[in-house]
């Protein structure tokens, strides 16, 4: 087998219906030097049985049955830590990739040795259709991580990750209040990687994402406000830990601290008033509105346009100073409890001073 070994992590739970199609897609990849690591969560015997034909017929496939529930983040992180390859790819159990997907990404990774991730276009279909090309991250580490903060785009998460960069990250952290979901942990992970290398979009290969209505991110849209608030605050604290450390001076770190808080506390979506009418239109079955629905679907599939009108997407949006104060309080509580961020070492400040200044800027202003 020519070329570096690539580990493909396939975490799965109750995915027996779609899993064989995905595994066959991996088995027939044009790039053959693969280590396909299937991690079956919570002793799910039915999903494990769906893997057996591949385990018997191809030595590149191996499987671990987890005795207890890890959740998607914990299960995915396990495959990252148990990788054998020089590169790693996360593969959702119910998605597929183009036949030369791995080969194309490996070729790009060898061509761009400074890239932490080489990733492909993501084509979503099902409940909605969209083409996502993500946001390439180039330049110096600060420029890359601030661009990552600005857009918070996760398309690159499905790309080819360089093992040497992956080894220098914290992996996928678990939130203590909802470890089976751990909203935003992949975004924190991507920000860590953005400090370690470039994100390169590779033309040609395609990741096919299936939106069947039960996807995790669709379920999050139905969360109650208090859960969205807590998850958003947790992610903000995680991002502070990663982004602020990239500053090259105390002044730059203070500026980056403010930029993170601004990104999470201050809504900036001039097109918000269109959301509810567009959603009602999408649910309508009126024949007279069909041409408009076709136009809306086309607009939603236009990645640059979608990005331009929804650049600052937020899981939880504050609408008044009291909500911002409450969100800010949770962010600081999370930072203190985690113990990974030291305001004295990073910003030559105290928790009390930081909170006072943050409230003055984002609550009292």
Question: Which residue stretches match the model-derived regions?
Answer:
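The conserved acidic donor/metal-binding loop of glycosyltransferases
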Residues: 92-96
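Short loop->beta transition adjacent to catalytic acidic/histidine clusters or analogous donor-positioning motifs
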Residues: 4-6, 27-38, 59-62
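Conserved donor NDP-sugar-binding/catalytic core segment of glycosyltransferases
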Residues: 100-132
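A conserved acidic beta->alpha catalytic loop
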Residues: 40-50, 68
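Glycine-rich, basic loop-to-helix element that forms the pyrophosphate-binding segment
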Residues: 66-83
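Short, well-formed alpha-helical segments that are part of the catalytic scaffolds
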Residues: 15-28
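Short aromatic/hydrophobic "clamp" motif used to bind/position activated sugar donors
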Residues: 88
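Conserved nucleotide-sugar donor-binding catalytic segment
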Residues: 142-223
């Amino acid at each position: 087998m020519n070329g570096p070994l690539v580990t493909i992590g396939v975490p799965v739970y109750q995915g027996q219906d779609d899993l064989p199609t995905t595994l066959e897609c991996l088995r027939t990849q044009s790039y053959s030097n693969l280590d396909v690591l299937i991690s079956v969560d919570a002793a799910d015997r039915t999903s494990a049985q769906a893997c057996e034909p591949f385990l018997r017929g191809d030595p590149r496939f191996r499987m671990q049955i987890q005795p207890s529930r890890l959740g998607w983040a914990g299960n995915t992180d396990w495959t990252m830590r148990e990788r054998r390859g020089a590169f790693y790819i996360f593969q959702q159990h119910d998605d597929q990739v183009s036949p030369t997907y791995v080969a194309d990404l490996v070729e790009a990774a060898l061509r761009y040795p400074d890239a932490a991730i080489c990733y492909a276009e993501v084509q979503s279909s099902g409940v909605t259709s969209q083409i996502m090309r993500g946001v390439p991250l180039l330049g110096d580490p600060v420029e890359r991580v601030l661009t990552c903060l600005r857009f918070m785009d996760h398309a690159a998460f499905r790309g080819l990750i360089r093992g040497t960069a992956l080894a220098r990250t914290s992996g996928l952290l678990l939130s203590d209040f909802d470890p089976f979901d751990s909203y935003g942990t992949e975004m924190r992970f991507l920000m860590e990687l953005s400090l370690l290398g470039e994100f390169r979009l590779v033309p040609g290969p395609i990741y096919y994402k299936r939106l069947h209505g039960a996807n995790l991110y669709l379920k999050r849209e139905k969360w109650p406000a208090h859960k969205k608030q807590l998850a958003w605050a947790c992610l903000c604290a995680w991002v502070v830990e990663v982004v602020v450390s990239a500053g090259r001076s105390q002044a730059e770190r203070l500026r980056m601290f403010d930029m993170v808080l601004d990104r999470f506390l201050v809504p900036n979506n001039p097109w918000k008033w269109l959301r509810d009418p567009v959603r009602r239109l999408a649910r309508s079955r009126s024949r007279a509105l069909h041409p408009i629905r076709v136009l809306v679907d086309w607009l939603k599939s236009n990645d640059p346009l979608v990005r331009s009108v929804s650049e600052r997407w937020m899981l939880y949006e504050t609408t008044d100073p009291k909500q911002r104060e409450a969100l800010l309080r949770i962010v600081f509580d999370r930072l203190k409890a985690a113990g990974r961020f030291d305001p004295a070492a990073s910003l030559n400040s105290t928790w009390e001073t930081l909170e006072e200044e943050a409230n003055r800027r984002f609550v009292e202003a």
